[in-house]
């Protein structure tokens, strides 16, 4: 893993901000470059599944690395634990894309309120499912100055789930017949969900 090493040319602060619409507190880490500012800001929005603020996966922490990279280049970065994960309140399992969009916008509002952040220069970088959340947030609020989508979905969600499920099933040692049945069940459930109002 390529974790950043000190000295850091930025401050690191553990923070909490509130999604007032949902009534939950979200916990994260704010990095602000050294200097007077104001600096442009960005909220990092994670991919699918319950993610911590560093988007930790298999010993890697891509959001920690990305926050370091951006803050070393003069950008304030807020990364946060998904609702119901780590130190954040709320419930992850029942959350929808709309809920995650509101969480991201709460992060944008929090950054805009920071003295050393340029309020009109706050955007969102979304990875994977976060690449779906970022444009939803930008459509919802003019406060979002820009978006960056990293490996955002370019195909229907069910196709992503099936494509991801097959190698995961193989890696877990599941028989191919079970993996194929799981794919059929996922597609059938997606079809049922489309029919429901």
List the model feature ranges, each with a label:
Residues 1-37:
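N-terminal cap/lid segment of alpha/beta-hydrolase-fold proteins
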Residues 56-77:
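Short amphipathic alpha-helix adjacent to the substrate-entry channel of hydrolases
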Residues 78-80, 84-95:
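Glycine-rich "HGGG/HGxG" loop immediately N-terminal to the catalytic nucleophile
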Residues 116-128:
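Alpha/beta-hydrolase fold nucleophile elbow
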Residues 131-142:
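Short glycine-enriched nucleophile-adjacent loop
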Residues 148-197:
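Accessory cap/linker subdomain of secreted extracellular hydrolases
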């Amino acid at each position: 893993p390529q974790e950043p090493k000190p000295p850091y040319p930025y401050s690191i602060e553990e923070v909490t901000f509130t999604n007032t619409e949902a009534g939950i507190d979200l916990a994260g880490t704010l990095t602000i470059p050294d200097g007077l500012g104001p600096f442009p800001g960005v909220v990092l929005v994670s991919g699918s599944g319950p993610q911590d603020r560093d988007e930790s996966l298999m010993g890697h922490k891509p959001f920690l690395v990305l926050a370091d990279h951006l803050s070393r280049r003069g950008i304030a970065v807020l990364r946060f634990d998904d609702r119901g994960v780590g130190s954040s309140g709320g419930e992850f399992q029942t959350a929808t894309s709309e809920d995650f969009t509101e969480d991201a916008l709460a992060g944008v509002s929090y950054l805009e309120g920071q003295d050393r952040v340029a309020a009109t220069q706050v955007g969102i970088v979304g990875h994977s499912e976060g690449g779906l959340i970022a444009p939803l947030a930008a459509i919802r609020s003019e406060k979002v100055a820009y978006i960056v989508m990293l490996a955002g979905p370019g195909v229907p969600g069910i196709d992503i789930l099936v494509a991801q499920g097959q190698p995961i099933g193989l890696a877990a040692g599941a028989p191919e017949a079970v993996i194929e049945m799981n794919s059929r069940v996922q597609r059938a459930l997606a079809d049922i969900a489309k029919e429901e109002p």
